[in-house]
């Protein structure tokens, strides 16, 4: 197999994973407020779940990126799927507020684990001659997935909410198979920032009242 073919396969795998994950994530998130209202829950309850959901999904990447650098991207990708799939299945199985909240927190946690990994893979598999193109394609795929997911979920939830959630579970399951069979571990730097320092950075971020308030407000009004 030629080096060019290897690179092309790696890029296709990375983009497929990102497209499927954005489909799974936004397919659930964009319709979640409608779903919760259909079950009779209030906007205040929606705000609580969304605040915690965004809190996890935007802070966990700091830690998951460090784990990927230290233990390998493929292992952390699989960990994300193992958090994602049971959470979506729980969302299918429960109608209680506590159950739905737990499912969404786990989905936010899983999305946070996944979030930096494909961007990190693109960074490690490109160089100064093609990095701009690589990231341009990457973010185009992010936008396609973010648009495609809600459209598909919207069509499916017109039949049943279960079908909409199942489409996300299927997408993550396909990601699992693609990762096991085709994902190639990118070369990693020999110098890895200590996990303890990353955790201290998170605590420093959380101590910023303005930033924490922003996350809460984002959840309430998203």
Place the predicted regions along the sequence by residue:
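Helix-loop junctions at membrane interfaces in 12-TM secondary transporters
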Residues: 92-104
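Symmetry-related core transmembrane helices of the 12-TM Major Facilitator Superfamily/SLC fold
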Residues: 163-181
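Central cavity-lining transmembrane alpha-helices of secondary-active solute carriers
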Residues: 51-64
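Intracellular juxtamembrane helix-capping segments at the cytosolic ends
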Residues: 113-126
């Amino acid at each position: 197999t030629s080096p060019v073919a290897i690179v092309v396969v790696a890029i296709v795998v990375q983009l497929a994973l990102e497209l499927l994950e954005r489909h799974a994530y936004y397919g659930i998130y964009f319709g979640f407020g409608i779903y919760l209202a259909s079950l009779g829950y209030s906007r205040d309850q929606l705000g609580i779940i969304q605040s915690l959901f965004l809190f996890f999904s935007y802070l966990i990447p700091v830690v998951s990126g460090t784990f990927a650098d230290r233990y390998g991207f493929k292992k952390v990708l699989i960990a994300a799927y193992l958090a994602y799939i049971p959470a979506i299945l729980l969302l299918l199985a429960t109608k209680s507020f506590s159950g739905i909240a737990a499912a969404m927190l786990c989905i936010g946690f899983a999305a946070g684990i996944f979030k930096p990994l494909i961007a990190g893979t693109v960074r490690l598999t490109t160089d100064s001659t093609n990095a701009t193109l690589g990231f341009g394609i990457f973010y185009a795929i992010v936008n396609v997935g973010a648009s495609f997911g809600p459209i598909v979920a919207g069509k499916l939830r017109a039949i049943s909410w279960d079908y909409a959630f199942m489409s996300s579970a299927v997408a993550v399951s396909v990601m699992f198979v693609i990762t096991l069979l085709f994902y190639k571990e990118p070369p990693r730097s020999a110098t890895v920032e200590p996990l303890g320092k990353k955790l201290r950075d998170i605590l420093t971020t959380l101590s910023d009242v303005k930033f924490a308030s922003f996350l809460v407000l984002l959840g309430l009004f998203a």
